[in-house]
């Protein structure tokens, strides 16, 4: 005979309760789901890349011993090309990647608020992304931002900021019980 699995023996109820705790029990509309999923995928790419970059920089000696890849030499050479001296470029990359992990963690919290259709998501979303871009541009260097940051990264950041701004605009107007009108022109349907 098979034993019946109780809720205390199965991990599924715990996972479902955790999901409900994080995302809430109410399902959002289709536009919110699409916007959330788009930003979640882009968030995951940036978070994974930041984690890998940080690990690679921290484990550069281990990588050299195991694989013979001179990560530190490669980074120092690129730093010299960008005008940095000695360990400065490496330390700045470590700092940027460490802080970017924190920034992307805050962005995930904002995505949870987006899924719950809270207007507060926008500020938690906007501040760390703008801070991240500022770190790359100001703390490392403008030439690093333009030459070493990929076009994909730049486009992904623009897509994230644009989609979040549009979504914020739409939920702000929805809370005011106004019709969504991007151009601000009243039409016959709007009561003109």
Where on the chain are the PLM-derived regions?
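Topology signature of small-to-medium multi-pass alpha-helical membrane proteins
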Residues: 2-192
């Amino acid at each position: 005979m098979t034993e019946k699995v109780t809720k205390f023996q199965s991990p599924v109820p715990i996972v479902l309760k955790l999901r409900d705790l994080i995302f809430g029990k109410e399902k959002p509309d289709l536009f919110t789901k699409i916007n959330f999923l788009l930003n979640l995928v882009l968030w995951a790419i940036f978070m994974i890349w930041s984690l890998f970059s940080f690990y690679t920089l921290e484990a550069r000696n281990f990588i050299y011993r195991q694989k013979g890849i001179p990560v530190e030499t490669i980074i120092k050479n690129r730093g010299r090309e960008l005008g940095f001296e000695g360990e400065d470029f490496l330390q700045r990359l470590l700092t940027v990647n460490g802080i970017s992990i924190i920034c992307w963690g805050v962005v995930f919290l904002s995505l949870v608020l987006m899924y719950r259709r809270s207007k507060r998501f926008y500020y938690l979303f906007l501040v760390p992304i703008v801070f991240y871009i500022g770190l790359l541009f100001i703390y490392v260097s403008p030439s690093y931002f333009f030459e070493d940051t990929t076009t994909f990264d730049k486009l992904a950041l623009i897509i994230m900021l644009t989609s979040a701004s549009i979504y914020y605009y739409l939920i702000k107007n929805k809370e005011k019980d106004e019709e969504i009108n991007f151009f601000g022109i009243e039409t016959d349907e709007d009561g003109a």
